[in-house]
Amino acid sequence: MDEFHRCGKEDSFWQQCFLYPLFFQEDLYAISHDHYLDVSSSSRPMEHLSSNDQLSFLTVKRLIGQIRQQNHSIVLFVNCDPNPLADRKKSFYSESVLEALTLVLEVPFSIWSKYSVEGMNECKSFRSIHSIFPFLEDKFPHSNSILDARIPYSIHPEILVRTFRRWIRDAPSLHPLRSVLYDYRNSPENLQRSIIVVPRVNTRFFLFLLNYYVCECESILFSRLKRSSHSRSLSHGSFPQRTHFHRKIKHIIIFSRRNSLKSIWSLKDPKIHYVRYGERPIIAIKGAHLLVKKCRYYLLIFRQFYFHLWSEPYRVCSHQLSKNCSSSPGYFLRVRMNPIFVRTKMLDELFIADLITNEMDPIVPIVPIIGLLATEKFCDISGRPISKLSWTSLTDDDILDRFDQIWRNLFHYYSGSFDRDGLYRIKYILSLSCAKTLACKHKSTIRVVRKELGPELFKKSFSKEREFDSLPFSSKAAARSQRERIWHSDIPQINPLANSWQKIQDLKIENLFDQ
């Protein structure tokens, strides 16, 4: 393992990376054995985790030898069996080898991804979800168009193996990978497909394949986009105001020509900015409409010829930020013109300059959220609240707490939007649905429930937004809450709820794609 880190920066190392001997290290299978037992212990009774699950390293060697001989009768990826005890021994060794394969491939991949993205392409990579919103606020106002793309989730298994061969010359180490991918492709649910669909399950092997596939796409795409991003000529007179001039001057580099007395001022920052959230990358572009069309055409051709995958044109959409909205992550994003007044005083004379700046304006997606609430049976498709019948067996406090948690998550997540009027419509739907649920439980009306239980129960719920206005860092929050926004740092916990409507749209596209 130390050899990987010592030779990580050498380009020739990736072509001489021999991983096959690592498959015969007993420590590797001890780690995979423990991980398999930890995962399976939650789904199997403890009495089944007995001495029958003792790992035999000799059996593992024989299994690897059979894989090396391309014996496809060995099923490495075993799907859900109707009999949980049938072929459990085969599944046990198959999962152990699969876990070991993942561990072996993760070691060079982690080093390769670090140096390929950050070293070769010289790109600043921000891996945290909390850097998305500052990035959007900083880059989107200076762009006029965006490309909303979806990462292709379907790919032929042989293409994945060939991409691994680009940086791993050791062919025997790729036989287990090829066997796993083809066995999964020949499974009943994928038998009618000509391509493999990476399942959206939380298994370590398929998460590794997804991360590798995304990193492979981005590493090649970054280098191409960087070559096509040329510097813009900029004169010194382009700075009418001196606000933050020192910070702007850091982003400028001067080129001098031999046969020219003039210097060319160019921006270091490229015209093209890339951000990815989950499976939805967004490319912000500053340029003419022809440049946007060329980038969109390049993305389609790139997927078609590099990954031998036909990508439908609707999977790469172009939008103008001033006219259209884009969805990411859970918001509808647009850029609006915001005029501001900057006053500068020079030599006892007052000059007033009217400057027009762009500002990102995130909009709460009211219609998709109402559709999500209708799917969860909180209202109908028109937004009329209905009772949540599946919660009528709970206690009153549990019902109020569940409705309260949903509202807190929605308000907490979308507090970064200026226009919050739509949120109060969602609040009305949830509060009335909560009242109807309590009335249905007690077999009465909303008026009777409010009279018997008292209004203090409703005061307890749906009022958490007042706590946000009284935070210590927001002085005079009552007056500032309507014109300032706060990106809260716990959005990973709220994010699945906020993006559920986008998953529904992706499923519709997948169904059209399968047909």
From Swiss-Prot:
Organism (species): Pinus roxburghii
A Pfam family it matches: Intron_maturas2
Entry keywords, A to Z: Chloroplast, mRNA processing, Plastid, RNA-binding, tRNA processing
Name of the protein: Maturase K
Taxonomic lineage from the root: Eukaryota, Viridiplantae, Streptophyta, Embryophyta, Tracheophyta
One of the record's GO molecular function terms: RNA binding
Family: Belongs to the intron maturase 2 family. MatK subfamily.
Location relative to the cell: Plastid, Chloroplast
Gene Ontology terms describing biological process: mRNA processing; RNA splicing; tRNA processing
CC annotations in GO: chloroplast
InterPro entries according to UniProt: Domain_X, Maturase_MatK, Maturase_MatK_N
Function comment: Usually encoded in the trnK tRNA gene intron. Probably assists in splicing its own and other chloroplast group II introns.
